Amino acid sequence: MVYILPVFMIIVAYFSGRLPEVLFKVNKRNHVSVSRGETCINGMFLLFVLWDIFAVIASYCGIGFTVIVRIYVAVLGIILIASNIILYRNKKPKQWYSDINIPRIFILAVVVLLLQFALIFYIAPDISEDNIKVSVLTIISDGRLHVTDPETGISEGYSVSLLGRIPELDSFYAMLAYLTDFKTEALMYRAVPVIVLLFSYMAYGLWADLLCDKTDDGKRKKSILYVVIGALNICGSISMSGIYYYQMHCGFRPEVIIFSVFVPYTAYLCYRIFRDKDHVCVAYLILTYITSFCVAGVIRGFIPLIAVSVISTMIVIWGDLAHKHGWIRNVKTGEGR
């Protein structure tokens, strides 16, 4: 069960993200359609925020951990059923893959991705200076939500700190471990890094859609981007430090999740908001901020995303001015100098 969790999480995230899009008619009101990768990312954020709400309620109402997990799973079941019913009633004759012309480089990109999965299952995870596993085991054994202080290593009752780390990530892992027959190590050190890697590819894939058109040459460029990202992760996995080392060895840590998924997605949303005037992305950006706070807290989650938003916005505004005055060439149209 634990090894099919990545596929299950993507399916649940997709339907959870698709439901509000259909209810609020996002694609019809907005001139830029929402891609499936963006739908999955937003759906995963919604699932995490929903668990955060349940965790807070369980803490302050004294509800047991197993009870809140069962309620959460029941709510997820209702969401999946409602999403499938609504999607069926709004079904359109649209294929997942409308063009079967696949560039050869895409096959290499898939091979590189599979190689990364194999490395995640082969290499030893870096568990130094990490107390997440202790918190997860404490929650499961004690039957209520706990958090382990990263400085003292002391297990304390559930608490929310505006200046530190909020413990929903630990409890979220505990919930997943409960659903996968308590395979805690396989979950945290194998399944979760695979999930993070997949969502990281989705986030960078959104940028690939912006920079590359839908022609065969554009698909080839996208595949090259995926190969480069995979090569960096593979090369980083054999180093002793660095961004890509942590991506492969510590994919379960909150700061790695923030860098791998939240940072590129936040920059993408800022581009859509200020360049494409896509106001729906404002709601997605707010959801991203809230989820980052729940995953890594203020210092390691929320504040870095605010910095990324400011920098991305400044770059987009400068780019618009540069395109307007013809200082740089447009990537897709070739206009400018």
For each feature predicted by the language model, list its residue ranges.
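Membrane-embedded, hydrophobic transmembrane alpha-helices
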Residues: 1-98, 305, 319-323, 327-337
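Active-site lumenal/periplasmic loops and adjacent helix-entry segments of GT-C-fold
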Residues: 115-236, 242-251, 261
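Membrane-interface alpha helices of multi-pass inner-membrane proteins
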Residues: 281-300
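Membrane-helix boundary/interfacial segments in multi-pass membrane proteins
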Residues: 4, 60-70, 239-258
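Specific aromatic-rich, kink-prone transmembrane helix
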Residues: 12-20, 253-275
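Internal/C-terminal transmembrane anchor helices
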Residues: 101-118
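Transmembrane-helix signature of membrane-embedded glycosylation machinery that interfaces
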Residues: 20, 24, 57, 204-216, ...
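Transmembrane-embedded, aromatic-rich helix segments that form part
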Residues: 299-315, 322
